[in-house]
């Protein structure tokens, strides 16, 4: 049985058994103490269905027995609020002040709930349990509880603040610097992420990008699209020339050969190679634990500053620009933790210089798009000013690789240097300095180090 079907069936059994218990209690067939005991057994039997993953931290949350009982108690509390709310609703378009006050009562506030029971003369009544049962009519009740959890998480985001040191103009200059790099495709990837604020896997593989106008790009196919999300595409503002961005995306996909990679492998590559370089380059500029996914959050903040209409609320802007449903504001609150601490007008040239230095320190190999034709290779072999014996041997190895694959043009993609080293070792029985190979390839493929 598929896991989703099994969980749905388990939910249904749980709901029915819970309803049987409360109906017995309402009909005086069970005492309150007996009810509590039965609830404990029920929670024990069904706690497995309450295992789930925290969407905010991606860590597994185990709702154990005590937590399961706590959920049940909180829903009893919620049923008290629900009954009073229904009793005080007179017209569908008008809500009394009392109902507005009920909205501010937490379902965990047992003291307040007891006050409500007393003030509404519900002490000796069991009828409010019927409202509790109503909350369990479908498995939606767990989603409702997850919503309460989500609100608590949003409130925690309000308290947590992470300050971003750079200003808007520095941000734009960083994007220009990264997009125009020819040393490593990872640098262009960071520039694209900062310029458009999309998910890494959308840039790498999943989505299609088109120029909307000189300041906007249209994206089709949204990753992590929820079933009820009717948004299939999104148009958003960008911090660089749309044509340059789209060409960079094509180059990234070509260099990484992502059409042959699964989403899982792409994520694995991001976690290691891409995140490591990102943290090296932006050390002490962004928080040390940040990764390439941080680019999405910082885009949201700076795009609001640069592009949002006057008086538009920030959470609404973030939701809109990311292509989320209007009522799905959790991500917006998550990104709102980041506070732009520097509102100066001028770009920080010293920081840009530092980034340039770090790029030349940490990026020691060529990994952007270049090509070599067989004609150029033949001319290089015939040239008289040969650097050394290893250089000419490298040219011969490359020629043999092209002949083996029947290629007239060889592209300098990521991993080619490793392929050349393996072929060199197989042919000549030894290898030479890796940095020297990088120097040779810059001459052969005609690019600057």
From Swiss-Prot:
Pfam families on file:
ResT-TelK_cat
Query: What molecular function terms (GO) are annotated for this protein?
Result: DNA binding; endonuclease activity
Co-factor remark: No cofactors were found to be necessary.
Q: What class of enzyme is it?
A: hydrolase
Q: What is its EC number?
A: 3.1.22.-
Q: Which UniProt keywords apply?
A: Cytoplasm, DNA recombination, DNA-binding, Endonuclease, Hydrolase, Nuclease, Plasmid
GO CC annotation? cytoplasm; nucleoid
A biological process from GO: DNA recombination
Does the record's keyword annotation contain DNA-binding?
yes
User: Where this protein primarily resides, as one coarse class?
Assistant: cytoplasm
| Compartment annotation | Cytoplasm, Nucleoid
Q: What else is known?
A: This strain of B.burgdorferi has at least 12 linear replicons with covalently closed hairpin ends.
What this chain does, per the record?
Answer: Catalyzes the conservative, sequence-specific DNA breakage and reunion reaction that generates two hairpin telomeres from a replicated telomere substrate. Breaks two phosphodiester bonds in a single DNA duplex and joins each end with the opposite DNA strand to form covalently closed hairpin telomeres. In vitro relaxed-circular, open-circular and linearized plasmids, but not supercoiled DNA, are all substrates. Cleavage is position-dependent relative to conserved sequence elements.
Per its record, how is this protein called by name? Telomere resolvase ResT
Q: Which organism's genome codes for this protein?
A: Borreliella burgdorferi (strain ATCC 35210 / DSM 4680 / CIP 102532 / B31) (Borrelia burgdorferi)
């Amino acid at each position: 049985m598929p896991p989703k079907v099994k969980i749905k069936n388990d939910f249904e059994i749980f709901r029915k058994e819970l309803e049987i218990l409360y109906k017995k209690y309402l009909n005086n067939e069970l005492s309150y103490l007996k009810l509590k005991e039965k609830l404990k057994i029920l929670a024990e039997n069904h706690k497995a269905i309450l295992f789930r993953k925290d969407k905010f931290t991606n860590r597994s949350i185990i709702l154990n027995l005590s937590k399961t009982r706590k959920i049940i108690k909180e829903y009893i509390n919620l049923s008290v609020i629900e009954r009073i709310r229904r009793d005080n609703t007179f017209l569908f378009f008008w809500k009394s002040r009392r109902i507005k006050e009920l909205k501010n009562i937490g379902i965990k506030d047992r003291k307040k709930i007891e006050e409500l029971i007393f003030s509404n003369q519900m002490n000796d009544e069991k009828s409010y349990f019927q409202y509790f049962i109503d909350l369990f009519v479908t498995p939606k009740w767990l989603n409702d509880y997850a919503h309460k959890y989500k609100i608590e998480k949003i409130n925690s985001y309000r308290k947590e603040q992470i300050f971003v040191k750079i200003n808007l103009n520095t941000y734009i200059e960083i994007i220009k610097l990264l997009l125009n790099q020819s040393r490593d495709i990872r640098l262009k990837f960071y520039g694209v992420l900062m310029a458009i604020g999309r998910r890494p896997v959308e840039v790498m593989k999943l989505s299609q990008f088109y120029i909307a106008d000189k300041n906007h790009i249209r994206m089709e196919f949204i990753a992590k699209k929820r079933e009820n999300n009717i948004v299939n595409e999104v148009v958003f503002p960008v911090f660089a020339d749309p044509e340059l961005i789209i060409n960079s995306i094509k180059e990234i996909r070509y260099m990484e050969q992502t059409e042959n990679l699964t989403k899982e492998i792409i994520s694995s590559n991001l976690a290691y190679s891409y995140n490591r370089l990102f943290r090296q380059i932006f050390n002490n500029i962004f928080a040390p634990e940040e990764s390439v996914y941080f680019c999405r959050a910082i885009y949201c903040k700076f795009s609001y500053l640069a592009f949002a209409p006057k008086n538009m609320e920030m959470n609404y802007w973030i939701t809109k620009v990311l292509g989320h449903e209007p009522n799905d504001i959790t991500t917006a609150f998550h990104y709102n933790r980041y506070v732009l601490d520097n509102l100066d007008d001028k770009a920080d040239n010293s920081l840009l210089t530092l980034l340039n230095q770090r790029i030349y320190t940490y990026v020691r190999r060529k990994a952007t798009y270049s090509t070599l034709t067989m004609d150029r290779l033949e001319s290089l072999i015939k040239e008289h000013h040969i650097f050394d014996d290893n250089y000419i041997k490298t040219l011969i190895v490359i020629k043999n690789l092209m002949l083996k694959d029947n290629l007239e043009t060889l592209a300098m993609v990521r991993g080619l240097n490793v392929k050349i080293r393996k072929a060199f070792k197989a042919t000549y029985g030894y290898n030479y300095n890796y940095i020297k190979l990088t120097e040779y390839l810059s001459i052969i493929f005609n690019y600057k180090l």
